């Protein structure tokens, strides 16, 4: 018998001062049995960074043809494709040709640094690609917010994400390895 996903619920309040975006949302995250808590929380952090009422989580690890989250327009085109991890060039190219904007969130300090050294020259050819990096220490702190039922406040200003719940406050600094040109 296959293991089932664990369901997490997040009620979020986002004040993105950089994009003048203010939003309250109730999110459901399905954590696949093979997904770490850190990776799931990075998915949530990516959602917060690009918060929009139309931004949706996809089937994620269960679907090779979909991103972790996407923002689809009224014509079913993809305005934003959010990817996590260390994808190969083929996957990046697919995302960048299908979506108007692509945001890649990398993690796992040692592997991510090596991946970036090997793929930086390939990534720069995609003008609609952002590559973000979150180091292990910060990811562990973000992961500490994980709970089956979460109520989170995120304030984003000057690229910094201030994350808080009823017990914790955290300043999250994503490193921009590449921004769209």
UniProtKB/Swiss-Prot annotation:
Pfam families, A to Z: YaeQ
Entry protein name: Uncharacterized protein YaeQ
SMART domains referenced in this protein's UniProt entry, alphabetically: YaeQ (SM01322)
Gene from which the chain derives: yaeQ
The organism of origin for this protein: Escherichia coli (strain K12)
Domain of life, source organism: Bacteria
């Amino acid at each position: 018998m296959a293991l089932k996903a664990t369901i997490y619920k997040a009620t979020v309040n986002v004040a993105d001062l950089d994009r003048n975006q203010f939003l309250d949302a109730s999110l459901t995250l399905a954590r696949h049995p093979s997904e770490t808590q850190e990776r799931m929380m990075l998915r949530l952090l990516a959602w917060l960074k690009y918060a929009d009422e139309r931004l949706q989580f996809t089937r994620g690890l269960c679907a090779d043809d979909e991103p972790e989250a996407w923002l689809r327009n009224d014509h079913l085109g993809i305005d934003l494709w959010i990817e996590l991890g260390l994808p190969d060039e083929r996957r990046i190219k697919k995302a960048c040709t299908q979506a108007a904007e692509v945001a890649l969130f990398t993690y796992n300090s040692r592997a991510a640094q090596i991946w970036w050294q090997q793929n930086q020259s390939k990534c720069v050819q995609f003008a609609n690609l952002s590559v973000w990096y979150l180091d292990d220490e910060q990811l562990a702190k973000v992961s500490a917010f994980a709970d089956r039922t979460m109520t989170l406040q995120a304030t984003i200003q000057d690229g910094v994400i201030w994350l808080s719940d009823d017990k914790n406050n955290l300043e999250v600094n994503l490193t921009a390895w590449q921004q769209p040109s």
